[in-house]
């Protein structure tokens, strides 16, 4: 038996990809702000070449999550998770938080020079 598709996996994938996309730039800044230093912080930029892949994966996952979350409630069977208004509202909130993370990942390299 397969579990019903409710968009949770796509939201998780989008959030994870957004975090990975900004890890190369945001990680060193956070560590420096917390007082950590050292030459090993430069090794965190090893993810930089993969940043476009992570951003692309995040955008694709967000597209599928958007399709699943913003479909009409009539498309859900009665008793399904997507038919409950509180769950739909929570998923929409999480979706927009993850979308904001992706926007931060997209814009962070352009804003980062102002912090260093």
Swiss-Prot record:
Membrane association type: Multi-pass membrane protein
Cellular-component GO terms for this entry: plasma membrane
Principal subcellular localization: membrane
Keyword Cell membrane: yes
Superkingdom as given in the UniProt entry: Bacteria
Endpoints of the signal sequence: none
Transmembrane segments: 16-36, 46-66, 94-114
This protein's UniProt keywords: Cell inner membrane, Cell membrane, Membrane, Mercuric resistance, Mercury, Metal-binding, Plasmid, Transmembrane, Transmembrane helix, Transport, Transposable element
Transmembrane helix as UniProt keyword: yes
GO MF annotation: an example: mercury ion transmembrane transporter activity
Residues where Hg(2+) binds: 24-25, 76, 82
Intracellular or extracellular location(s): Cell inner membrane
Family as reported in the entry's similarity comment: Belongs to the MerT family.
Main function: Involved in mercury resistance. Probably transfers a mercuric ion from the periplasmic Hg(2+)-binding protein MerP to the cytoplasmic mercuric reductase MerA.
Name of protein: Mercuric transport protein MerT
Species, as recorded: Serratia marcescens
Lineage: Bacteria, Pseudomonadati, Pseudomonadota, Gammaproteobacteria, Enterobacterales
Underlying gene: merT
């Amino acid at each position: 038996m397969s579990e019903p598709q409710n968009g949770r996996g796509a939201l998780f994938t989008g959030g994870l990809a957004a975090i990975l996309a900004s890890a190369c730039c945001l990680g060193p800044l956070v560590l420096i702000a917390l007082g950590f230093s050292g030459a090993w912080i430069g090794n965190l930029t090893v993810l930089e070449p993969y940043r476009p892949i992570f951003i692309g994966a995040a955008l694709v996952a967000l597209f599928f999550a958007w399709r699943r979350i913003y479909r009409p409630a009539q498309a859900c069977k009665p008793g399904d998770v997507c038919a409950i208004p509180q769950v739909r509202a929570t998923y929409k909130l999480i979706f927009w938080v993850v979308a904001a993370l992706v926007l931060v990942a997209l814009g962070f390299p352009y804003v980062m020079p102002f912090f260093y």
